[in-house]
Amino acid sequence: MAGFLNRRGFIKRSLAASAGLTLPAGHNKPALAAGPAEQSTNFDMPMGKIRHVGISRLICGGNLIIGSAHERDLIYVASLMRHYFTDNKIIETWQLCEECGINTMIGPVNSPYAFGEDPTIRVYNRYCKEWGGQIQWIAQTYPKTYDLTGSIQMAIDNGAVGAFVHGGIGDNWVRNNRVDLLAKAFEFIKKNGLIAGCACHSIEVPIALEKAGVDVDFYMNTLHSDDYWSATPKAERPEHDLPPHDNMWCTKPEQTIEFFRGVSKPWIAFKILAAGAIQPQKGFKFAFENGADFANVGMFDFQVRHDAIITRDIIDEIKRKGRPRPWME
């Protein structure tokens, strides 16, 4: 525990020293110097709210800790991720998030993409019970047509404050005209006191849910620009599905931005860095300027403080200048 506490003290001092500073783009910059211990340790992370739950505008994503990094054709990366993110490293990362004002993480309920080794629930329980961790958990769930509630119930039983339907499931059910299944899943989530959401990679999902008047608390929709070298050219993008090379998750950013300007529900944008292909300064700015209320970002421990500072500075600037879509508080 001493190692974590020493890091906690360092983070408090360095965050105080960083107040008012803006980081240049990228994660590969040197750490800011630690300031005097007597300085204020408060980090003013912008906050929002989804129904009754207060949530930091930057949310810690969960793909990295299960080894799901969308590594394209780099076959060693998933194993590297799983070896890096030991239980203690996950705990350390969440603790750093709390130090930096990030009060919420998103993580799966026994993800089928975790190679049978999803640590999320086990480590979250350890973090809360053994370390006194207070980070909130919004659970990514995997309802099935023959079992809508089992995965959701596991999230409820393990202390989640919210739950949403996995994006691939949301895409598939809307494509197959099963909005009714999504509505039933949301109803079960809300009945148990959690905030309910739907994730998706296709803008057709929130369009269909809004048209049907489905009672959902928030949307999780991908948003990133196509200004990176491995993005699929527009002429080659499928009309409805994602490109086949695991390299792009928002094929219609302009349409997504335009649609959400007319949506009054909170929007958590994810894949805002195109799974590591876009610099944080650029990706965060694109997401928040274009209407996202929250950003879900997978982070290594050494990226947390940089991303927190970038988020704070970009949102402060946007709130001074304004943006076309109002913030959903």
What name fits each language-model region?
Residues 1-18:
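N-terminal secretory signal peptides and thylakoid transit peptides that target proteins
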Residues 199-284:
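Catalytic alpha/beta core domains of metabolic enzymes, predominantly
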Residues 303-325:
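C-terminal helical cap(s) of enzyme catalytic domains, especially alpha/beta-barrels
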Residues 141-217, 248, 263:
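Glycine/proline-rich, positively charged
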Residues 25-59:
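C-terminal segment of N-terminal export signals and the immediately downstream linker at the start
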Residues 169, 223-225, 290-304:
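Glycine-rich phosphate-binding active-site loops on the catalytic face of alpha/beta enzymes
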